[in-house]
Regions:
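Cytosolic nucleotide-utilizing catalytic cores of signal-transduction proteins
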Residues: 3-199
């Protein structure tokens, strides 16, 4: 937002909050509607408008752990100072790949939980959550090198789309685990079908 006077911006904020209330009231008719509005900082010139849009996008990324139907203002405090490598290090990555190579789905799911637990204290940092989630998906996909079908069912683009749809941190990790189990079941069924074919 262009910084003219904070007094002039306040009515805009009030109208946005009023919009959220109105949309929330529609939930009785449309129960699947969810809305979050991100607001960037005010800036002293028109040149800052792009920065304000970027900050608004980052505010929306920080939606994990917020209540639904929330108006989220960008804040520098939402940065945890952690890197994705600190949460999802090479040791953890290699462990996941080892379990996948053994086709040990239970071990793989436990390690996905481990990543989720390590990241959970920093779920307010949307950029970090997105980066770690992306790295986890890339690793799981790489671990499916043994399965062309698995790689075709586990597409990065689908995960990025689904990430944008999910609003809750626990739901995010629950979803990736259930999808990973689904892909594993399809793969195991294909193996059984191949083995049962007459020679």
């Amino acid at each position: 937002m262009y910084k003219r006077q904070d007094k002039e911006i306040e009515p805009v904020r009030k109208k946005l909050k009023h919009l959220i209330v109105n949309v929330s009231n529609l939930k009785t008719v449309f129960p699947d509607i969810r809305i979050r509005i991100g607001q960037g900082n005010t800036h002293s010139s028109y040149m800052g408008i792009t920065d304000s849009f970027r900050e608004a996008e980052l505010a929306i990324m920080n939606r994990m752990g917020e209540n639904e139907d929330t108006y989220i203002c960008y804040s520098e405090d939402s940065k945890s100072g952690k890197t994705k490598e600190e949460i999802f290090d090479s040791g953890l990555r290699n462990e996941i790949l080892t379990y996948q190579e053994r086709m040990d789905i239970e071990g793989t799911l436990r390690l996905v939980d481990k990543v989720g637990e390590k990241l959970k204290p920093f779920k307010y940092d949307g950029k970090l959550v997105y980066e770690v989630f992306g790295e986890l998906v890339e690793t799981l996909r790489f671990g499916m090198k043994y399965s062309r079908e698995g790689r075709n069912l586990f597409l990065i683009e689908d995960y990025k789309k689904q990430y944008r749809r999910i609003w809750d941190y626990d739901e995010l990790f629950q979803w990736i685990k259930s999808d990973l189990s689904r892909v594993h079941q399809v793969y195991m069924k294909n193996i059984q079908d191949e083995e049962s074919k007459p020679i």
